[in-house]
């Protein structure tokens, strides 16, 4: 029987949803089967993320070109991967990590390595005639994730004065992924009408949520609660709220304060918001270096709500293990491009789950039409996904893919709709 191996890798520079370059990669086997992947890019990034290689040539794309990463795919990764079994994902990824030889993939670029890693896995799935989620997750892949929908954008995702980066809804009362998407869409359109009535802008931010000029984080939360009610749902019962504070973006490392507030005061602000609003998840409520603050936040709120580490962990198994040992957070945001390979992404998720931490598969603010994260959320049974609002086709593509997976799974599929920290 002919062994199926990597025979060619193609790559090209494409544009993401913000109009900046990113990589498209195609891995082709000796039997003609292939897999394709487009690499996302973040605006709000953790300092310990794997390096996204950019050209720094200011004469094109404001220095954000990825021609060097593209060159690395063709001239470095292709030669070392030709002839490698398409089904040996661990070997494929380890060869690339070794070829790079740096702790944060700065030599070849995490964007180059991830593109090849994902495209190779998709080529393997195509060779077997399987859906990508089924190839990666096997027979255990069956949980449809509850979406965390970013309806109001702030922080580094919008230029509107809001301190926090994402104000999200979670359709926890839905009984299926399709129903969850419908509920989110109803609230999204209701919110747009509310903004129009208040003569507020209805332009959207990077992730498809609205970016109105508001005076405070509380005003954004008030609008979401009102939109939920006007759409015919019960806040906290059918639809809950979630925050991504992206606190590192407003943390002063010299004074160790958050807009003038110390860590304990910042935790107090978040606790007060949880008392006043049906919030059941807070991401990056403290800065990534503020371990003492994270301990306070987890102790204060961690028994009742999800405390999510993004910049804190950057999908890195070593950092996740360190955080677990210190009792920081109780959930991990998973972004494959933060670590750079499918194998390491899998390791991060398995480690988190083994220690009772929940996981959330996440997009980036710079996305493409690639729907990989939808399949990965089901493959790894994360139970939750962040893939933006109910607008912009690069966000909607993921929801549409999830609904297709739900239909394919049929009675085998289970929609994950509860907060694991609520005691329900």
Curated annotation (Swiss-Prot):
It is found in: Cytoplasm; Secreted; Cell surface. The active site is at 207 (proton donor), 335 (proton acceptor). The keyword Metal-binding applies. CDD domains: enolase. Its main location: cytoplasm. Pathway: Carbohydrate degradation; glycolysis; pyruvate from D-glyceraldehyde 3-phosphate: step 4/5. Mg(2+) binds at residues 244, 283, 310. Its EC number is 4.2.1.11. It is an enzyme of class 4 (lyase). One of its GO terms (biological process) is glycolytic process. Coiled coil: none annotated. One of its GO terms (cellular component) is extracellular region. GO terms for molecular function: magnesium ion binding; phosphopyruvate hydratase activity. Pfam families: Enolase_C, Enolase_N. (2R)-2-phosphoglycerate binds at residues 165, 335, 364-365, 386. It catalyses: (2R)-2-phosphoglycerate = phosphoenolpyruvate + H2O. Binds a second Mg(2+) ion via substrate during catalysis. It comes from the Bacteria. Keywords: Cytoplasm, Glycolysis, Lyase, Magnesium, Metal-binding, Secreted. PANTHER family: ENOLASE. Catalyzes the reversible conversion of 2-phosphoglycerate (2-PG) into phosphoenolpyruvate (PEP). It is essential for the degradation of carbohydrates via glycolysis. Belongs to the enolase family. This is Enolase.
